């Protein structure tokens, strides 16, 4: 288990259910998995049983993908995923597809940039396609997975946020403070999501912040850069790292 992984994200990664992963690891607490834990990964269902690999996802509202090409012609995509339910969810992913110039259907899986989406919350998903100079800009999205959150999340608050844009509006420096509910909670993730005037995601990046021992708050300062066009606003989200 590496930093940032949960039973939900690991299950999605290996194409198995969370229940199967829990049964295969009866001595591991899914709500508190130490980094470095070695898990037993059960075999995925045989070919032909793919429909039963992932549980039916909890309803999630997906927005149209915002996709850009970098200097290497890779296709980088973001899309908002919103949780309409009254409880947190995790393991959210979507399958992105487009038809290439040669008639081949290209697919990539977009994963959430934080583990959990709180009740009523919105979180971007992220995917990268290999280089394709002939891509015509089209992209479809289909919900792939979303499960109830098994994690017990400690309280975290973001305050004192200040956003400074450069003259061109193509980069943003964001400062603020993370306040934890419990001292010594350790590592936190801070996600910055830049948007243009229409609310379209132009950049998103996750950073790590380490809370000093015995302290309940820590200040942060991070920079993000637009993949295309101007940044008008920046969402600042945070959660404890697993």
Language-model features: where?
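Acidic (E/D-rich), amphipathic helical modules within compact regulatory domains
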Residues: 12-39, 106-147
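Hydrophobic beta-strand segments
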Residues: 94-97, 110-111, 188-193, 207
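Asparagine-centered strand-capping/turn motif at beta-strand->loop junctions
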Residues: 25, 81-86, 178-182
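Intrinsically disordered, low-complexity Pro/Gly/Ser/Thr-rich segments with frequent PxxP/GP/PP motifs
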Residues: 105-134, 201-229
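Terminal connector regions
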Residues: 48-68, 126-173, 203-204, 210, ...
């Amino acid at each position: 288990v590496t930093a940032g992984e949960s039973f939900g994200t690991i299950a999605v990664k290996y194409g198995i259910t969370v229940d199967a992963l829990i049964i295969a690891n009866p001595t591991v607490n899914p709500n508190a998995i130490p980094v470095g834990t070695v898990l037993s990964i059960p075999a995925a269902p045989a070919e032909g049983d793919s429909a039963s690999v992932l549980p039916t996802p909890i309803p999630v509202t997906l927005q149209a993908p915002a996709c850009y090409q970098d200097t290497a012609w890779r296709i980088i995509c973001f899309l908002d995923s919103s949780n309409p339910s009254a409880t947190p969810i995790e393991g959210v992913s979507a399958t992105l597809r487009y038809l290439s110039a040669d008639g081949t259907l290209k697919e990539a899986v977009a994963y959430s940039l934080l583990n959990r989406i709180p009740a009523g919350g919105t979180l971007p998903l992220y995917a990268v396609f290999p280089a394709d100079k002939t891509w015509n800009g089209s992209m479809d999205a289909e919900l792939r997975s979303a499960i109830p959150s098994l994690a017990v999340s400690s309280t975290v608050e973001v305050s004192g946020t200040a956003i400074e844009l450069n003259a061109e509006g193509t980069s943003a420096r964001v400062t603020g403070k993370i306040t934890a509910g419990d001292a010594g909670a350790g590592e936190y993730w801070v996600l910055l999501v830049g948007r243009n005037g229409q609310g379209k995601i132009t950049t998103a990046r996750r950073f790590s912040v380490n809370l000093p021992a015995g302290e309940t708050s820590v200040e942060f300062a991070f920079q993000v850069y637009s993949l295309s066009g101007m940044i008008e606003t920046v969402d600042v989200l945070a959660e404890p790292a697993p």
